[in-house]
A protein has these predicted regions:
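A short glycine-rich, Lys/Arg-flanked "PGG" loop and its adjoining helix->strand segment in the class I
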Residues: 247-259
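Core SAM-dependent methyltransferase catalytic element
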Residues: 322-344
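Short amphipathic alpha-helical interface segments
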Residues: 21-39
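Conserved Class I S-adenosyl-L-methionine-dependent methyltransferase catalytic core
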Residues: 10-15, 23-24, 32, 61-165
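C-terminal alpha-helical "lid/dimerization" subdomain adjacent to the S-adenosyl-L-methionine
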Residues: 266-321, 328
Length: 344
């Protein structure tokens, strides 16, 4: 490793850059720079309808952070085409959007510190903008690939969806995945469960905007499924490891699936063993989001505290214990962060 003091300075600078990238996303400054035109701070502020003094100081951070280029001869700023594609809504993946996680997680730092001292957890309602940030992330990773890449991982599933089956999404959040499936497969019926009233309300509104007539969103604790519900397909996108009682939830899912049904689970692509994650390209980030959200929201409900980094080995073990005798694990080239489990 390089000199540790230099490493720490680099960490501090990159943490600051991450915050400014988030600000650049939320203020749409990067979108204003997407065409790579050189602008003064006054021109950029006017184009973005923002306060020039704040824009100028933000530019100071992203120039010294080697994000934005600066020409001192005419005091203009520009974003290269390569960087514009990775930092704006017009690109294939918006890293600036993902930086919102840093401030969203830091919001509960005081409560997390108390948990270190006294135990317990931080409840969902303590988080600021969490569902919004999660929806943004899902819109980049899950939604663009859902119909053409993720669903076809299951043999004959797309054909069955076209004909008409019953689908349940566990921990549906803001309903992005379910609403997209409902829009593409109008002959199938889609139900979404989440215990967040705010998320269910948002999902319902979005469904109405899309004109979906085949969706039902319900505020439901997935530890307690309605006894009479049976589904051909159950999905869970980045949801199982947050549960207070994940083993019970998996048991309920198995019971709710028809004999010829499928459980499709997307979850973090990691090992259950720390030593195997030391070279994971997002290891520090994923353990951090687990500690500051996934694990603690479970512990807040007196839960198991499984955490985001429960790993493939533990996931397969728990799926087997829930009664899924066949578990196939897939990865997609566009998504190095997640595993896709096909269980029956």
């Amino acid at each position: 490793m390089e000199n540790f003091e230099d490493y720490m300075l680099d960490v501090m600078n990159k943490a600051a850059i991450a915050l400014m990238l988030s600000v650049g996303h939320r203020t749409k400054l990067f979108d204003s720079m997407y065409d790579c035109t050189s602008m003064t701070s006054e021109q950029l502020a006017a184009k973005s309808n923002l306060n020039e003094r704040y824009v100028r100081e933000w530019l100071g951070a992203v120039v010294t952070g080697k994000i934005v280029d600066y020409n001192p001869s005419n005091k203009t700023y520009s974003l290269s085409e390569e960087k514009a594609k990775l930092l704006s809504r017009g690109g294939s993946y918006n890293f600036a959007s993902s930086m919102q996680w840093i401030s969203a997680l830091a919001y509960v730092e005081d409560e997390i510190v108390k948990c270190f001292e006294k135990g317990g957890g931080v409840p969902y309602e303590s988080y600021h903008r969490f569902h919004e940030v999660m929806a943004d992330e899902s819109a980049q990773t899950v939604l663009p690939a859902l119909v053409n890449d993720i669903l076809p991982l299951v043999p004959n599933l797309v054909e069955r969806l076209k004909k008409g089956i019953r689908v349940l999404d566990v921990g549906c959040g803001s309903g992005g995945a379910l609403n997209l499936m409902a829009k593409n497969f109008p002959n199938s019926q889609f139900t979404g469960y989440d215990f967040s009233k705010q998320a269910i309300e948002y999902a319902t509104i979005e469904s109405e905007k899309l004109g979906n007539k085949n969706t039902s969103f319900q505020k439901q604790d997935v530890e307690h499924f309605p006894e009479n519900e049976t589904f051909d397909l159950v999905t869970a996108f980045d949801a199982i490891h947050d549960q207070a009682a994940p083993a019970k939830v998996l048991d309920n899912i198995r019971r709710a699936i028809k004999d010829d049904g499928i459980f499709l689970m997307q979850d973090i692509g990691s090992s259950s063993q720390l030593e195997n994650n030391k070279t994971h390209p997002l290891g520090p980030f994923l353990y951090t989001i687990s500690c500051l959200h996934c694990m603690t929201v479970s512990l807040a409900l007196d839960g198991h505290g499984l955490g985001a980094m429960w790993g493939k080995e533990k996931a397969i073990e728990m799926l087997n214990e829930a009664g899924f005798s066949e578990v196939d694990v897939k990865q997609l080239p566009h998504d190095p962060i997640n595993y896709y489990y096909i269980a029956k």
